[in-house]
Amino acid sequence: MSASESQTQARLLAQALPFMQRYENKTIVVKYGGHAMGDAELGRAFAADIALLKQSGVNPIVVHGGGPQIGAMLTKMGIESKFEGGLRVTDQKTVEIVEMVLAGSINKEIVALINQTGEWAIGLCGKDGNMVFAEKAKKTVIDPDSHIERVLDLGFVGEVVEVDRTLLDLLAKSEMIPVIAPVAPGRDGHTYNINADTFAGAIAGALRADRLLFLTDVPGVLDKNGELFKELSVAQARALIKDGTISGGMIPKVETCIDAINAGVHGVVILNGKTAHSVLLEIFTEHGAGTLIVP
């Protein structure tokens, strides 16, 4: 490394210092998903980011998805994926595979990556410590022919109804980094598959997290010219949904951000997980790396 490169690194570290102080002892929930989960190099960069957050005095919590991996396993086992209104129908056999893939495979891969940095990660799901309880999701769609609203039966797809933060509070006082799969029990004894974005939002809300980061495959919220919004208020975000600037799959993502803020999260960021070290760029630099949504 040349002297100029060393000076550049030193300057970057010095610039990061006030942000390290700003987030010390703060909780940051990171929803990990999208393209980054399938790229080994990006996976290692993500693990290093989480490790550095912990070493800097931050309390990081990882929530992960795994839709493509679930689909691949169902195909491998000869089970056809069924969708209603764009949502996966999860019968008893499917939810068993979902739990196996999310809590048994993907979760442990992420834990191993973080542990390779020298930090201690622990794999969990909503069942552990009675952390999360769910109930059957209530979803409706408008029939395009009759224009009548009908209820979708998605099987064991759930919505979070209760978060007990006791276990997470204990882990926050330890050296452990929680990595959580979005699977949870219901009071009815069934296991439910929960959308990872809404699961992460529920966890962050229960903890009154300082930040909730959504790692996606896009840079953030874009205007009609394709330029990135660096920061939006909840009111501004709602107006952009109303006028069509925010559309398609970004609508439920932004609505989840708004729900998390209403639950007590101080700020939610949508950022590009395909950019190496995007978590550090967002937390420890002045301009961040995505779109910050605030109250």
Curated annotation (Swiss-Prot):
Coiled coil: none annotated. GO terms for molecular function: acetylglutamate kinase activity; ATP binding. It catalyses: N-acetyl-L-glutamate + ATP = N-acetyl-L-glutamyl 5-phosphate + ADP. The record marks 31, 253 as: Transition state stabilizer. The keyword Transferase applies. GO terms for biological process: arginine biosynthetic process via ornithine; L-arginine biosynthetic process. One of its GO terms (cellular component) is cytoplasm. Keywords: Amino-acid biosynthesis, Arginine biosynthesis, ATP-binding, Cytoplasm, Kinase, Nucleotide-binding, Transferase. CDD domains: AAK_NAGK-C. Pathway: Amino-acid biosynthesis; L-arginine biosynthesis; N(2)-acetyl-L-ornithine from L-glutamate: step 2/4. HAMAP family: ArgB (MF_00082). NCBIfam families: argB. Catalyzes the ATP-dependent phosphorylation of N-acetyl-L-glutamate. PANTHER family: N-ACETYLGLUTAMATE SYNTHASE, N-ACETYLGLUTAMATE SYNTHASE, MITOCHONDRIAL. Belongs to the acetylglutamate kinase family. ArgB subfamily. This is Acetylglutamate kinase. It comes from Allorhizobium ampelinum (strain ATCC BAA-846 / DSM 112012 / S4).
